[in-house]
Amino acid sequence: PWLQDPDGDGTFTWSTASIPAGNYEFKVAHGLSWAENYGAGGARDGANIGFSVPSDGVVVTFTYVLATHQISVKTSKAGATPDLTKAKAFLVARDLVAWPAAAIPAGVQPELLHWRLHWSRTGGLAVDEETVTGGSLADLWYDPAGLPSALLAAHPELAGYVALRVPPKTAQQMPAILKGQLAVAMYDVTGLLLDATGVQSAIGLDSMFSRSAAQRRYGVHFSDRKPTFRVWAPTAQKVTLLTWPAGSDPAAPSSAASRRVMTAADDGSWSVEGAPLLKNARYLYEVVVYAPSTGKVETNLVTDPASVALTLDSTRSVAVDLADAAFMPAQWRSTASPALRSAVDSTIYELHVRDFSVNDTTIPAEHRGSYLAFADDGVGMRHLKALARAGLNTVHLLPTFDIASIEEDPAK
């Protein structure tokens, strides 16, 4: 049979369920001849590689890496495709995993199956023909009571999933376990690997942390002129605050930044207190975290998800104190905010900051499409004033959050 490389990455595979139960040997040959062949250990002209098929109908997958000549073979039940890059299982609480019933072989009772939880802080979990390798593991047990009704009401997408319980000792370690790679494997009564998958953890993270984490204030907040920086990153292994002076070049390298290691709290948040001189400083978080997208621990530089100010094109967050009078328009001090007797008295006009003035030729070109247009006496503002005289009392700005993918430099 031909091994194929459909995605062109240099890894050739072939799978079949047609090999009867028994013991076999194989090797890989190039060009339909034995002139160039590879066997055990990837050695040229190496020994045949032995493997066993435990029963008829088992899927056998052969893999050959062209660059290294490494060869492997694994077996699994028909219909199952162990793949840790997928995430079919859900961690829904520190002691509970949801497994899709559709992934259980037809006609097999879940009581007769066996599951294991695997984890590694550094990643590197892999699947061979027998099990998930690397890291630590714990046995899971099937709970015939199923998933809690309250969970299913909140997450109807989990209907049809079976409940797997995590041992108490492992459950206590779950916040630390979630800082690395996580996988669940399923085996039959003989110990044959049937399936293996990665794990989605968002529901479990909410279950463990959301109540206490919601009591925190995130972003940067000032008290007695001192800023406190806080970010929620429960799966991070380390978080460091990087700061650059106020008004500094947003393109300044990270090597020029001041660094402050942040402290983790039990609710998944990280925080650090800064000095008054950090007012209006540019900053980023350096986050060390396991990334399922790459299968490795990565170091990422990210802006603050709770930013109240950012530099051009969102390259850096800015530590702005919103209570600072310097950011208050002078007119606000002498203009009382109108009060309505009841919300139903509102007459609301919705508008988009950009669309309000982007084509208004009665205001300076550099103000068009921006907040500055509201300070001009253009046709847009004259129209709003006319509406106000007619009874309009509320302006609702459509979403004004920062969109990092939109170019902000007018010159571009």
Language model: regions and residue ranges:
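Long, charged/polar, low-complexity intrinsically disordered N-terminal extensions
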Residues: 79-145
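Non-catalytic, glycine-rich low-complexity segments
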Residues: 79-107, 190-236, 309, 313-326, ...
